[in-house]
Amino acid sequence: MIEIKNVSKTYPNGTKGLKNIDLTIERGEFVVVVGLSGAGKSTLLRSINRLNEITDGEILIDGLSITKAKGKELRQIRQRTAMIFQSFNLVKRSSVLRNVLSGRVGYHGTLRTVLNLFPKQDVELALQALNRVNILEKAYSRASDLSGGQQQRVAIARALAQEPSVILADEPTASLDPLTTKQVMDDLKRINKEDKITTIVNLHFIDLAREYATRIIGLRAGEVVFDGPVSEATDEKFAEIYGRPIQEDELLGEELDEPASEHASQ
């Protein structure tokens, strides 16, 4: 469970990134956050795992305050809170397997991880994670040799290697084509269902949000202006969230319905 209690974020220049956010996200939910660029979507996700420091309020993950946590306790909470980025954040010169193993860094000492001395069970866990996203055959390839879709699936495998209770995905499909977008979202949704991992995803495309979410949260200028099930997320509601009618580039379109064939090759 994630509890966001009256959270605000004010930047040094006075800009309000978040305004009095109150949300409770239950274990196993698949939540999609939508809103215009600058609405606070990334700020919210980065505040949950404390990549951003909030100005007011408190955030609890599984009953533990990440806002107040320090040292070992903070590291332990972050170990269980995996982040997936739009830009993949892989070490391109390293192998796919080594990138996935970086998800285990929080469980070991610095020297051991620098020297790549991961125990056998960690290697097995990393390989299993790659298999779950259908990219096991690329384990010993350089990350730089992979397509964008393959790199994002490596990032998902890295998140899985953390054995998280929460996955935060910040625009994970923004740089991908429609077919690969569906494959990546299918992976995230399947993992959410199978492992009951609480998943929060920031998305640009409205139809994608409707297809995958169990709950949609709409942000506008740092405030929650919609929070409800997909059935209530009408075009009119999205127009309220965005402050204007839906535009064509906010819909992925019919290509979303193409069969996700050749999954591992994209």
UniProtKB/Swiss-Prot annotation:
GO terms for cellular component: plasma membrane. Disulfide bonds: none annotated. The keyword Transport applies. Signal peptide: none annotated. Residues 2-246 form the ABC transporter domain. It holds the Pfam family ABC_tran. It is found in: Cell membrane. ATP binds at residues 35-42. SMART domains: AAA. The keyword Nucleotide-binding applies. It comes from the Bacteria. Transmembrane segments: none annotated. Belongs to the ABC transporter superfamily. Phosphonates importer (TC 3.A.1.9.1) family. The complex is composed of two ATP-binding proteins (PhnC), two transmembrane proteins (PhnE) and a solute-binding protein (PhnD). This is Phosphonates import ATP-binding protein PhnC.
